[in-house]
Amino acid sequence: MKAADEPAYLTVGTDVSAKYRGAFCEAKIKTVKRLVKVKVLLKQDNTTQLVQDDQVKGPLRVGAIVETRTSDGSFQEAIISKLTDASWYTVVFDDGDERTLRRTSLCLKGERHFAESETLDQLPLTNPEHFGTPVIAKKTNRGRRSSLPVTEDEKEEESSEEEDEDKRRLNDELLGKVVSVVSATERTEWYPALVISPSCNDDITVKKDQCLVRSFIDSKFYSIARKDIKEVDILNLPESELSTKPGLQKASIFLKTRVVPDNWKMDISEILESSSSDDEDGPAEENDEEKEKEAKKTEEEVPEEELDPEERDNFLQQLYKFMEDRGTPINKPPVLGYKDLNLFKLFRLVYHQGGCDNIDSGAVWKQIYMDLGIPILNSAASYNVKTAYRKYLYGFEEYCRSANIQFRTVHHHEPKVKEEKKDLEESMEEALKLDQEMPLTEVKSEPEENIDSNSESEREEIELKSPRGRRRIARDVNSIKKEIEEEKTEDKLKDNDTENKDVDDDYETAEKKENELLLGRKNTPKQKEKKIKKQEDSDKDSDEEEEKSQEREETESKCDSEGEEDEEDMEPCLTGTKVKVKYGRGKTQKIYEASIKSTEIDDGEVLYLVHYYGWNVRYDEWVKADRIIWPLDKGGPKKKQKKKAKNKEDSEKDEKRDEERQKSKRGRPPLKSTLSSNMPYGLSKTANSEGKSDSCSSDSETEDALEKNLINEELSLKDELEKNENLNDDKLDEENPKISAHILKENDRTQMQPLETLKLEVGENEQIVQIFGNKMEKTEEVKKEAEKSPKGKGRRSKTKDLSLEIIKISSFGQNEAGSEPHIEAHSLELSSLDNKNFSSATEDEIDQCVKEKKLKRKILGQSSPEKKIRIENGMEMTNTVSQERTSDCIGSEGMKNLNFEQHFERENEGMPSLIAESNQCIQQLTSERFDSPAEETVNIPLKEDEDAMPLIGPETLVCHEVDLDDLDEKDKTSIEDVAVESSESNSLVSIPPALPPVVQHNFSVASPLTLSQDESRSVKSESDITIEVDSIAEESQEGLCERESANGFETNVASGTCSIIVQERESREKGQKRPSDGNSGLMAKKQKRTPKRTSAAAKNEKNGTGQSSDSEDLPVLDNSSKCTPVKHLNVSKPQKLARSPARISPHIKDGEKDKHREKHPNSSPRTYKWSFQLNELDNMNSTERISFLQEKLQEIRKYYMSLKSEVATIDRRRKRLKKKDREVSHAGASMSSASSDTGMSPSSSSPPQNVLAVECR
């Protein structure tokens, strides 16, 4: 994309437009791997030379006169005729995404870089591979030569020159010889080097009187005048001289053994870093060995030696080092036809055809392309594979040929490379002979390809049967070896058979392949492999029946919950699968390459989200299974699913065994870290105190199915231990399926019906009261139960059940104890989360927590629940907010949870390590609650948050304010709240001594004492560190707009206040000061713009405003116009958070609020995007004020439109779900309207619709 006036290369920090998925996006250059090739015209002898920019002194500009270093080391004057920027630029897009690109994919910001005539949206989805309209129509000449017009005469000269050069490079008698090169600087000095073909390196011009050599000392390539070269008979040099002269030792080893020196090879780890795909090649290669062994059984003739991963690594090490030394490093995994290109295999296939120069026909190249196993997407296949070969391997082929370097599996039993130097007719004959042989070698050499393996192996078998008399004699010895090896593999198979009768051969070989995949390149000793196999087989044995029965049930049960679980299961199996998809109807129907991004079940039918290769993601679509053509080795999703499920189950069985062993030792099963990271998902659903889970008739099927699964499972697991436990678990069993079924439903609906919830809760609490006495036992049983839950469902259900049970226990006494149970529920949740991430050791801590929670329950139990609704003054929201939020949270929690979970579920899975850190934190916090009454600890157990950042120190209190100015921001998903919250948790707040000893479920505000200013400041500094983390997490959220990511505080749905935010950070810095009473009401600004929002907004705002009921919101509104910034110190934003039912204790008196205010009399203002100071407006005259406000409105409107589109997509999904839940939602709707009319506190009426309202409306 370089224009004439652009610099030769770009520097770090340059703003550019970079190509990303076919479109140009704003980006900044982060790092540069600089490599500028300069073509210069030497004034002295009028010849051209290609040098790198470090060989040139002077300005890098076409036409500039510079000094350039010539091959003999001297500097000559020259004119730059062409500059090529071959640098690699790592750019960072504004969303934090990074890409490493060449200069051709970048252009300086502000350049016109698209054809204005059309947008990508108008392009038809007809043929993604022939994407005919270029994004920019500027670059016409795509050839590698300079774009200056070339005259016919010049062309002829060039071609004749090339022919001469070819002859010269083939006939040079020095090729492959070790020579001594006289050093250019000191004439007395010399170094050993290997003479190689000049065509190895296009960038170095080698004149007629020069040779290209590779030094044994630094492995670099040099063109050296022939007069400076002397042939050396290294083999006859005395040992003393060999050891003294650097490089001589290496040269002599090379001559004797043809082993290249280490400095001519790249470390394999570097190769794996630069091309992560090579990682997969290793295992795939061993995988293929298995296939080959099977092929050998069916086809005794195959005498080829086993494919050699070591040799392949050896090849890659030399190739990568060669490419780097000649200035063309392979920085990214080479790709051909959307598949990783296996360079070793390509090299071998071309070698068998007589080398690149001897392949004249496109058909041969096409055959090579097919043999690589890459599907042919278009007519350019043969051209593409040829150019890929020329780019990556041609120079290396020339180098190997001239240096006589060979690779076992490439040249094995084949005519030696030297023979390729015969004249053309001979090598063509050779190619024909080899042609017949090629398929054979191919069976052997499939290091990467298993994609079209079925069709390919058929083809191979046919060809294998062709007579091959001539060659067989030469390979007799080899075939004997082969037979021995076959016998070994057969023995191995027999062993496995005896151990595992149920499992058929196919399955077993699949298992072996899995092992090999695991073992990868490590070349694990055979015994170890066998051991692993045996273990797996014995596990398999016991599980086989279980799996079968379960699979049957999975297919039978069509319940929503089941469907969803299936979908969960399928996703890991199918995601990323490359498939073909039929597009269009009738005559116009075409088939496209695509990959499956995710799967979903709709009315019992599986839908797949596919991404068409070569197409913008806007063309991704949901398709039914009948439009998908599965690859042969997949045979549809089912097979693969089952295989994966089986492997998963094997590993789970192992875990279970371990656990049982430990149970017997400690009397309690440690929850292993293998609990899936989906845990928060299950937990959050139930963790909210009010909206626990609603029972609806449609769920009964689900219950039955789940219970059936449980029963089957128990029968099949014959351990007595478990049988005994089953009795204890009966009650839990009954409850479990209900809850998990509901949870699943809730996932789908993203709605909760408080009415149902309350009913259910009452019922549950009765049951729980019975259970509660032996709570510890129950927790253990729950854990066991979780482990028993049906394996077929993958780990999801396991975690769900566990969390449900825990929550169930935690919900005990909710009715009796007012807000207190929330605390417990939450901490239990924490502990279960912890379990998820830690091994059994942490469990002790968890148990401690649980016990402490019991104590706490007793303390808190005394406070009456009526206090929840008590609000003296809606406008006094300030300090007490954190306490007041609790009650509101209770109501709103349920809905928020849902939102969160949906968004965070995935992230949680990605970030177990962070969760782990935070969990540890949480544990400390929970115990600190009790130990340090003088401190306020913030315990933010939101799993979501934890994902985004490590938890903040125990003394930090979350201070959360939100800008309600932009109501539309409410629509943003609660995700941002999480991020914001975490960033805001930096502000630490002190609590008045008058506070009753209420432990907040989240922040464990256990202290009646006030922290001193100094303390709060020091704590603040600790917690501030996290701000950066949070903002990053926030940016990464799907739903975020640019605006939001820039300004984390804007979008907080549950924001308690309009412009409190304004002072948010400053107050932090200034030691948490408090604004005067008058301001406090402003938080509620614009709170009630739409009726639907009233409850959500009220809820959210009230979380900050002192639990005012809806009726009290009206006075609050009056102040809203003033919009003076207010700071509230104890606002702890967690209410949004999915999990925390009782964030804040409701028992706070107005007097205390006033005390707070006195303590912190003032806080300085801080301006954010859509919040501003009144004095700012006062300073303007009326017209300025109007234009200013109009600008603000305009921004808000833009923002609103972006949210609107998001809402549309969510609505579409909801419509599908609504069909199923119409009756339930009616009940919920009436409930919500009642609550808004009567002014009930949101704690008792959280309308289900708001789940989404909060998220996006």
Curated annotation (Swiss-Prot):
Recorded GO cellular component terms are: nucleoplasm; nucleus; plasma membrane; Sin3-type complex; transcription repressor complex
Q: Where is the Tudor-knot domain?
A: 576-628
Q: What is the effect of changing residue 619 to A?
A: Abolishes binding to trimethylated lysines
Give the matching SMART domains.
Answer: ARID (SM01014), BRIGHT (SM00501), CHROMO (SM00298), TUDOR (SM00333)
Subcellular localization is given as:
Nucleus
Composition skew (Acidic residues), residue ranges: 151-165, 276-289, 301-310, 538-548, 562-571
Please list where the region (Retinoblastoma protein binding) is annotated. 951-964
The molecular function terms in GO held by this entry are: DNA binding; transcription cis-regulatory region binding
Domain called ARID: residue spans: 309-401
**Sequence ranges of Low complexity compositional bias:** 1226-1248
- Does this entry carry the keyword Methyltransferase? no
Enumerate the residue ranges of region (Disordered): 141-168, 271-310, 412-469, 485-579, 632-750, 775-800, 873-893, 1063-1167, 1212-1257
Principal subcellular localization: nucleus
Q: Which residues carry this modification: Phosphoserine?
A: 676, 716, 864, 1109, 1145
Which regions are flagged for Basic and acidic residues bias? 290-300, 416-436, 485-501, 549-561, 647-662, 705-749, 775-790, 1063-1076
Q: Which UniProt keywords apply?
A: Chromatin regulator, Differentiation, DNA-binding, Isopeptide bond, Nucleus, Phosphoprotein, Spermatogenesis, Transcription, Transcription regulation, Ubl conjugation
Subunit comment: Identified in mSin3A corepressor complexes together with SIN3A, SIN3B, RBBP4, RBBP7, SAP30, BRMS1, HDAC1 and HDAC2. Interacts with BRMS1. Interacts with RB1. Interacts with ARID4B. Interacts with AR.
Entry remark concerning the domains of this protein: The function of the Tudor-knot domain, also named chromodomain-like, is uncertain. One study suggests that it mediates binding to lysine-methylated histone tails, with strongest affinity for H4K20me3 and H3K36me3. However, another study failed to find any interaction between this domain and histone H4K20me3 peptide.
The record's function comment reads: DNA-binding protein which modulates activity of several transcription factors including RB1 (retinoblastoma-associated protein) and AR (androgen receptor). May function as part of an mSin3A repressor complex. Has no intrinsic transcriptional activity. Plays a role in the regulation of epigenetic modifications at the PWS/AS imprinting center near the SNRPN promoter, where it might function as part of a complex with RB1 and ARID4B.
Task: Provide the protein name.
Answer: AT-rich interactive domain-containing protein 4A
Q: Which organism is it from?
A: Homo sapiens (Human)
